[in-house]
């Protein structure tokens, strides 16, 4: 009996909080449609950001390849020494 009263209490609390949330919607939810209407001037920024990200990715890949080659050379030298 106590468990069922507890469950009923939880349901009442759930519906009460839902009612409060519907009465006072989140301001961020109102701002979302405004943020969706991004001006066309933001497109070049996106393109330059993408180019910068691609350059950074290429630099990271080159550094990783150099590190791998250096590690392989060091391992080969250590193996040759015995």
From Swiss-Prot:
Induction: By winter conditions, at least in part by water temperatures of below 8 degrees Celsius.
InterPro entries noted in UniProt: Antifreeze_1
Modified-residue entries (Arginine amide), positions: 81
Disulphide bridges, residue numbers: none
GO BP terms, alphabetized: homoiothermy; response to freezing
Subcellular localization, as worded in the UniProt entry: Secreted, Extracellular space
Record's signal peptide: 1-23
Gene Ontology terms for molecular function: antifreeze activity; ice binding
Record keywords: Amidation, Antifreeze protein, Repeat, Secreted, Signal
A cellular component annotation (GO) from this entry: extracellular space
Post-translational modification: Amidated.
Propeptide cleavage-removed residue intervals: 24-44
Tissue: Detected in liver (at protein level).
Function: Contributes to protect fish blood from freezing at subzero sea water temperatures. Lowers the blood freezing point. Binds to nascent ice crystals and prevents further growth.
Family: Belongs to the type-I AFP family.
UniProt protein name: Ice-structuring protein B
């Amino acid at each position: 009996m106590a468990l069922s009263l507890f469950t009923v209490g939880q349901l009442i609390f759930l519906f009460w909080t839902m009612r409060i949330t519907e009465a006072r919607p989140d301001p961020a939810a109102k701002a979302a449609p405004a943020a969706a209407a991004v001006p066309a001037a933001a497109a070049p920024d996106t393109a330059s950001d993408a180019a910068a990200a691609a350059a950074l990715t290429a630099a990271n890949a080159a550094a990783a390849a150099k590190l791998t080659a250096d590690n392989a050379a060091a391992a080969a030298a250590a193996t040759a020494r015995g």
